[in-house]
């Protein structure tokens, strides 16, 4: 995924910065504990597509 995209994308719910999870191909919002999938190199920023994360999972992203 193009890292310059991270400079403009934010969480659609709270507008927080997102963290790239290369291994799982997700963009993580630590504030809302959500992981937005990246499919075929395209971030899917739909709330209904996001996966709820545990606090332990969120902590892996710094």
From Swiss-Prot:
Superkingdom field: Bacteria
Any one GO CC term of the record: cytosol
Protein family: Belongs to the UPF0434 family.
PANTHER family for the chain: PROTEIN PREY, MITOCHONDRIAL, ZGC:162634
Name used for this protein in its record: UPF0434 protein FTM_0733
